[in-house]
């Protein structure tokens, strides 16, 4: 019921659309933001780099440095190695969450945290809200590493083609904190045009709160290779993506992939936040678009 267009658009997102309509009068997208938005609308995915997207701030490099510090912690390496042993033995998930938040302790974020500063920046939120045409809620964040798998391993969990169940339209922002320049590094892969209103939207559709996992080989039989996009890039590559579209994570067979991810949904989503905002009294200093993004978690 929540995902029916009249309910989703006119009822559940009425307030967030009105707030955005008033706020966007003051928004001026840079040429890079405008290009990202255009690609996101056309294909459901847009790729840029922090050096051009955050050309006037250090937010991109701050989160890369913070990710590197976490990865260099001996406890992180111990956690990844333990997960690799478990996965090879029991076929558990192929991702290790280094900030918590997935069956673990929720990440505790405050305004000085580089992960939150990045996520709530006007650079990010202005693009996300422009695509969604409404204020959005910041629901989930994760810094995660893939584990190394033997070549030829069978796809499991997020390595399989799927559509996220969380909303009929949503945005995930991915930041590569390591080089992902070949298939062995586990590139993110997306079917261009599988987002809402896209040309491949009706192929293996999701009906929130239920996603979709196509049968093995099903996507390849229907979708031409030109529309199955692998996102390669150096450290600092930034991906905006509507993950209600068909997508999958990659196999890391030669090198682990370190990536930060942030999820933004509409007010229709029943997805609970996976982080804790530790200084809610400080939220008053944020712009309206950022206050709204964390308002469900204050």
List the predicted regions and their residue ranges.
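A short secondary-structure junction signal
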Residues: 139-140, 150, 154-159, 171-172, ...
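Short, conserved beta-strand element in jelly-roll/cupin
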Residues: 166-182, 232-233, 240, 263-266
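Active-site region of the double-stranded beta-helix
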Residues: 134-137, 162-166, 177-186, 191-195
